[in-house]
Swiss-Prot record:
It holds the Pfam family Zn_ribbon_RPAB4. Part of the RNA polymerase complex. One of its GO terms (molecular function) is DNA-directed RNA polymerase activity. This is DNA-directed RNA polymerase subunit Rpo12. Binds 1 zinc ion. SUPFAM superfamilies: RNA polymerase subunits. Gene3D superfamilies: RNA polymerase ii, chain L. It comes from Natronomonas pharaonis (strain ATCC 35678 / DSM 2160 / CIP 103997 / JCM 8858 / NBRC 14720 / NCIMB 2260 / Gabara). Keywords: Cytoplasm, DNA-directed RNA polymerase, Metal-binding, Nucleotidyltransferase, Transcription, Transferase, Zinc. It catalyses: RNA(n) + a ribonucleoside 5'-triphosphate = RNA(n+1) + diphosphate. Its EC number is 2.7.7.6. The lineage of its organism: Archaea, Methanobacteriati, Methanobacteriota, Stenosarchaea group, Halobacteria.
Length: 44
């Protein structure tokens, strides 16, 4: 799963046992990125 650090804005891939911390700046607030899927909805 891909996350983005809220301080340095870099993309971060988390390991299962690595903990929740940015490896670049050490910040602990990571934002989950939205999926890039496009959804179509029919309207009547």
């Amino acid at each position: 799963m891909s996350y983005k650090c809220s301080r340095c804005k870099r993309d971060v891939e988390l390991d299962e046992y690595g903990g929740v911390r940015c490896p670049y700046c050490g910040h602990r607030v990571l934002l989950k990125e939205r999926s890039r899927d496009i959804k179509e909805v029919e309207v009547e």
